Amino acid sequence: RGEEVESIAVMEQFKSGRPLLLVLPGSHNKFVSVDAEGKMTGCLTSISGELLASITNDTIIAKSVGKQFVEEETYDREWLLKGYDNAKRTGLGRTCFTARILQLFYEDAPPKIANFVLGAALQGDVTAVLHSDALKVSPDTTVVVGGKNPLRQAIVDILEHEGYFARIETYVPEEGISLSALGAYLVAEKNGIL
Protein backbone atom coordinates (compact mmCIF):
# COMPACT_ATOMS: atom_id res chain seq x y z
CA ARG A 1 0.00 0.00 0.00
CA GLY A 2 1.04 3.58 -0.54
CA GLU A 3 1.71 4.69 3.00
CA GLU A 4 3.81 1.64 3.78
CA VAL A 5 5.99 2.17 0.70
CA GLU A 6 6.32 5.90 1.50
CA SER A 7 7.17 4.96 5.08
CA ILE A 8 10.08 2.79 3.94
CA ALA A 9 11.58 5.82 2.19
CA VAL A 10 11.30 7.93 5.35
CA MET A 11 12.57 5.11 7.60
CA GLU A 12 15.68 4.84 5.44
CA GLN A 13 16.56 8.42 6.41
CA PHE A 14 15.81 8.03 10.14
CA LYS A 15 17.65 4.94 11.37
CA SER A 16 18.00 6.17 14.92
CA GLY A 17 17.42 3.01 16.94
CA ARG A 18 14.45 4.80 18.51
CA PRO A 19 10.75 4.25 17.93
CA LEU A 20 9.26 6.52 15.28
CA LEU A 21 5.87 7.90 14.36
CA LEU A 22 5.79 8.78 10.68
CA VAL A 23 3.21 11.38 9.69
CA LEU A 24 2.32 11.56 6.00
CA PRO A 25 -0.28 14.31 5.49
CA GLY A 26 -2.60 14.63 2.52
CA SER A 27 -6.25 14.10 1.67
CA HIS A 28 -5.90 11.04 3.90
CA ASN A 29 -3.48 11.72 6.74
CA LYS A 30 -1.42 8.62 7.45
CA PHE A 31 0.34 7.77 10.70
CA VAL A 32 2.74 4.81 10.89
CA SER A 33 4.42 3.60 14.08
CA VAL A 34 7.86 2.01 13.79
CA ASP A 35 9.68 0.22 16.62
CA ALA A 36 13.32 0.76 17.61
CA GLU A 37 14.37 -2.14 15.34
CA GLY A 38 12.82 -0.44 12.31
CA LYS A 39 9.71 -2.63 11.99
CA MET A 40 6.32 -1.09 11.26
CA THR A 41 4.05 -1.82 14.19
CA GLY A 42 0.85 -0.05 13.20
CA CYS A 43 -0.94 2.28 10.82
CA LEU A 44 -3.74 4.77 11.27
CA THR A 45 -5.41 6.73 8.47
CA SER A 46 -7.90 9.59 8.71
CA ILE A 47 -9.96 11.53 6.19
CA SER A 48 -9.24 14.91 7.76
CA GLY A 49 -7.96 16.24 4.42
CA GLU A 50 -11.24 15.31 2.76
CA LEU A 51 -13.20 16.80 5.64
CA LEU A 52 -11.23 20.03 5.31
CA ALA A 53 -11.95 20.12 1.55
CA SER A 54 -15.67 19.62 2.18
CA ILE A 55 -15.78 22.26 4.91
CA THR A 56 -13.82 24.72 2.76
CA ASN A 57 -15.86 24.25 -0.40
CA ASP A 58 -19.28 22.80 0.40
CA THR A 59 -20.57 24.18 3.71
CA ILE A 60 -21.77 27.45 5.16
CA ILE A 61 -18.14 27.99 6.21
CA ALA A 62 -16.98 28.24 2.56
CA LYS A 63 -17.76 31.97 2.42
CA SER A 64 -15.95 32.59 5.73
CA VAL A 65 -12.73 31.09 4.34
CA GLY A 66 -13.22 32.47 0.83
CA LYS A 67 -13.25 28.87 -0.48
CA GLN A 68 -9.48 28.99 -0.02
CA PHE A 69 -7.13 26.61 1.72
CA VAL A 70 -4.22 27.86 3.81
CA GLU A 71 -1.16 28.57 1.64
CA GLU A 72 2.46 28.95 2.81
CA GLU A 73 2.19 32.74 2.62
CA THR A 74 -1.10 32.82 4.57
CA TYR A 75 -0.11 30.30 7.25
CA ASP A 76 -0.85 31.70 10.72
CA ARG A 77 0.25 29.57 13.67
CA GLU A 78 -1.75 31.62 16.19
CA TRP A 79 -5.06 31.12 14.37
CA LEU A 80 -4.27 27.46 13.65
CA LEU A 81 -3.79 26.77 17.36
CA LYS A 82 -6.93 28.73 18.27
CA GLY A 83 -8.91 26.41 16.00
CA TYR A 84 -7.13 23.35 17.36
CA ASP A 85 -7.77 24.29 21.00
CA ASN A 86 -11.39 25.19 20.30
CA ALA A 87 -12.02 21.84 18.57
CA LYS A 88 -10.37 20.03 21.46
CA ARG A 89 -12.89 21.67 23.81
CA THR A 90 -16.05 21.75 21.68
CA GLY A 91 -15.59 19.39 18.70
CA LEU A 92 -15.18 19.90 14.97
CA GLY A 93 -18.77 20.83 14.11
CA ARG A 94 -19.12 23.53 16.75
CA THR A 95 -15.64 24.91 16.03
CA CYS A 96 -16.45 25.25 12.34
CA PHE A 97 -19.58 27.21 13.15
CA THR A 98 -17.52 29.32 15.54
CA ALA A 99 -15.32 30.13 12.54
CA ARG A 100 -18.35 31.61 10.81
CA ILE A 101 -19.23 33.69 13.87
CA LEU A 102 -15.63 34.91 14.12
CA GLN A 103 -15.64 35.95 10.47
CA LEU A 104 -18.98 37.75 10.72
CA PHE A 105 -18.42 39.61 13.99
CA TYR A 106 -14.74 39.62 14.94
CA GLU A 107 -12.17 39.02 12.21
CA ASP A 108 -13.26 39.38 8.58
CA ALA A 109 -10.03 37.87 7.26
CA PRO A 110 -10.67 34.61 5.36
CA PRO A 111 -7.00 33.46 5.58
CA LYS A 112 -7.09 33.66 9.39
CA ILE A 113 -10.40 31.83 9.50
CA ALA A 114 -8.99 29.19 7.12
CA ASN A 115 -6.13 28.60 9.59
CA PHE A 116 -8.67 28.31 12.41
CA VAL A 117 -10.60 25.67 10.43
CA LEU A 118 -7.37 23.82 9.52
CA GLY A 119 -6.47 23.56 13.21
CA ALA A 120 -9.95 22.25 13.96
CA ALA A 121 -9.77 19.66 11.17
CA LEU A 122 -6.42 18.33 12.40
CA GLN A 123 -7.43 18.11 16.06
CA GLY A 124 -9.20 14.77 15.71
CA ASP A 125 -6.08 13.23 14.19
CA VAL A 126 -4.00 14.10 17.26
CA THR A 127 -6.63 12.60 19.55
CA ALA A 128 -6.70 9.47 17.38
CA VAL A 129 -2.91 9.11 17.48
CA LEU A 130 -2.66 9.59 21.24
CA HIS A 131 -5.49 7.15 22.01
CA SER A 132 -5.09 4.61 19.22
CA ASP A 133 -4.78 0.89 19.81
CA ALA A 134 -3.40 0.58 16.27
CA LEU A 135 -0.29 2.69 16.93
CA LYS A 136 2.40 2.15 19.51
CA VAL A 137 3.62 5.57 20.62
CA SER A 138 5.00 7.10 23.80
CA PRO A 139 6.54 10.45 24.74
CA ASP A 140 9.93 8.96 23.74
CA THR A 141 8.74 8.27 20.19
CA THR A 142 10.43 10.50 17.61
CA VAL A 143 7.83 12.01 15.29
CA VAL A 144 8.84 12.56 11.66
CA VAL A 145 6.44 14.73 9.66
CA GLY A 146 6.59 14.60 5.87
CA GLY A 147 4.42 16.18 3.22
CA LYS A 148 4.31 19.72 1.92
CA ASN A 149 3.93 23.02 3.69
CA PRO A 150 1.81 24.51 5.08
CA LEU A 151 0.30 21.19 6.19
CA ARG A 152 3.66 19.82 7.37
CA GLN A 153 4.32 22.93 9.47
CA ALA A 154 0.77 22.94 10.83
CA ILE A 155 1.15 19.38 12.10
CA VAL A 156 4.55 20.16 13.64
CA ASP A 157 3.15 23.25 15.37
CA ILE A 158 0.13 21.37 16.70
CA LEU A 159 2.23 18.47 18.01
CA GLU A 160 4.68 20.87 19.68
CA HIS A 161 1.74 22.76 21.19
CA GLU A 162 0.23 19.51 22.48
CA GLY A 163 3.53 18.72 24.21
CA TYR A 164 3.25 14.92 24.30
CA PHE A 165 6.21 14.02 22.08
CA ALA A 166 9.73 15.10 23.07
CA ARG A 167 11.20 15.00 19.54
CA ILE A 168 9.48 16.23 16.40
CA GLU A 169 11.37 16.40 13.11
CA THR A 170 10.47 17.05 9.50
CA TYR A 171 11.41 15.19 6.36
CA VAL A 172 11.58 16.85 2.96
CA PRO A 173 12.73 14.54 0.14
CA GLU A 174 15.13 15.74 -2.51
CA GLU A 175 13.56 17.88 -5.23
CA GLY A 176 11.77 15.80 -7.84
CA ILE A 177 11.83 12.48 -5.95
CA SER A 178 8.48 11.22 -4.67
CA LEU A 179 8.34 9.19 -1.47
CA SER A 180 6.37 6.47 -3.26
CA ALA A 181 8.99 6.10 -5.99
CA LEU A 182 11.87 6.09 -3.50
CA GLY A 183 10.11 3.54 -1.28
CA ALA A 184 9.28 1.29 -4.24
CA TYR A 185 12.91 1.48 -5.36
CA LEU A 186 14.13 0.47 -1.89
CA VAL A 187 11.70 -2.48 -1.77
CA ALA A 188 12.79 -3.64 -5.23
CA GLU A 189 16.46 -3.27 -4.29
CA LYS A 190 16.05 -5.24 -1.05
CA ASN A 191 14.25 -8.05 -2.90
CA GLY A 192 16.91 -8.31 -5.60
CA ILE A 193 14.67 -7.02 -8.37
CA LEU A 194 17.15 -4.24 -9.18
Specify the residue positions occupied by each region the protein language model found:
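Glycine-rich phosphate-binding loops at beta-strand->alpha-helix junctions
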Residues: 139-158
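Glycine-rich phosphate-binding loop plus the immediately following alpha-helix
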Residues: 1-21, 30-86
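Phosphate/pyrophosphate-binding loops at sites that engage ATP/ADP/AMP, CoA/4′-phosphopantetheine
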Residues: 126-139
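Adenine-nucleotide phosphate-binding core of ATP-dependent small-molecule kinases
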Residues: 85-128
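Gly/Ser/Thr-rich loops at beta-strand to alpha-helix junctions
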Residues: 24-30, 148-152
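Short glycine-aspartate micro-motif
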Residues: 20-24, 144
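Short hydrophobic/aromatic-enriched beta-strand-loop microsegments
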Residues: 40-46, 163-172
